[in-house]
Design a protein with these regions (language model features):
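Generic hydrophobic transmembrane alpha-helix motif, especially the helices
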Residues: 71-108
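Hydrophobic alpha-helical elements at and bordering transmembrane segments
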Residues: 24, 28, 32, 66-73, ...
C-alpha cells in the first residue's frame, strides 16, 4: 500500500493501453461488456428453462430427470474445461478467433446451470396456495406463472443472477482460451 499509492495517477484509467501505459480502464470496460452480454444471453434461457422444468414438465418424467442430472453435472465442471470447449468449438472450429462473442457464449454456457437451478428452486419455493388462488380467480396457467409465480420467486431468481455475475467476473480460465488476454 505504501509503495503503491504514489503510483496512482490519471493514466491508470486512460483509454489507451500500451506497454508504457498499462491502463486498467480497457479491462474494466471489457469486463462490463462481457458480463452484460453473457447475462443478456443466459438469463432469459435460464429462467424460461426453469419455468418449464418447474411448472410445465412432469416431475417424474425421464426427460426432466435427465435434464436435472445434466444440469447438476454441468455445475461441477471446472472453468478450464469450459474454456477448452469454447476454444475448440468457437475459436478453432467456427474460426471466430479470440473474440468477445466466443467468450460470451462460453461464459453463458458456463453460468446457465447456475441460473437454471436457482430459478427452478425459487419457482418451486412459491407456495401452492398462490397458484390455487390465481386459478380460483379464473387465471390460466401462463398468466399465473407470469403474474403470480415469477414476481413471488423474483428474490431467489435475482440471487441466482447475482451469483452468476460473480462467476462471470471471476472466471479467467475460460476467457484465456476464448477471448484472449491482450486488450485492444
Amino acid at each position: 500500500l505504501i509503495k503503491g499509492v504514489p503510483n496512482l495517477s490519471a493514466d491508470l484509467f486512460s483509454l489507451k493501453y500500451s506497454s508504457a501505459n498499462q491502463s486498467m480502464l480497457p479491462s474494466i470496460i471489457n469486463t462490463v461488456y462481457l458480463t452484460a452480454l453473457t447475462l443478456l444471453l443466459a438469463v432469459p434461457v435460464g429462467i424460461f428453462s426453469a419455468i418449464y422444468l418447474a411448472e410445465y414438465a412432469r416431475k417424474s418424467s425421464f426427460f426432466v430427470k435427465i435434464i436435472n442430472v445434466a444440469n447438476e453435472t454441468l455445475s461441477g465442471i471446472p472453468s478450464i474445461v469450459y474454456g477448452l470447449f469454447g476454444f475448440l468449438a468457437f475459436v478453432i472450429s467456427k474460426k471466430w478467433g479470440y473474440s468477445l462473442s466466443a467468450g460470451v457464449i462460453t461464459l453463458a454456457i458456463m453460468v446457465l446451470p447456475l441460473i437454471i437451478r436457482t430459478s427452478q428452486e425459487a419457482i418451486l419455493g412459491v407456495d401452492n396456495s398462490f397458484r390455487e388462488a390465481s386459478y380460483g380467480l379464473g387465471a390460466g396457467k401462463l398468466r399465473t406463472v407470469f403474474k403470480i409465480v415469477l414476481p413471488s420467486a423474483m428474490p431467489g431468481i435475482l440471487s441466482g443472477i447475482i451469483l452468476a455475475i460473480g462467476r462471470i467476473v471471476g472466471e479467467t480460465a475460460a476467457l484465456i482460451y476464448t477471448a484472449g488476454t491482450v486488450p485492444e
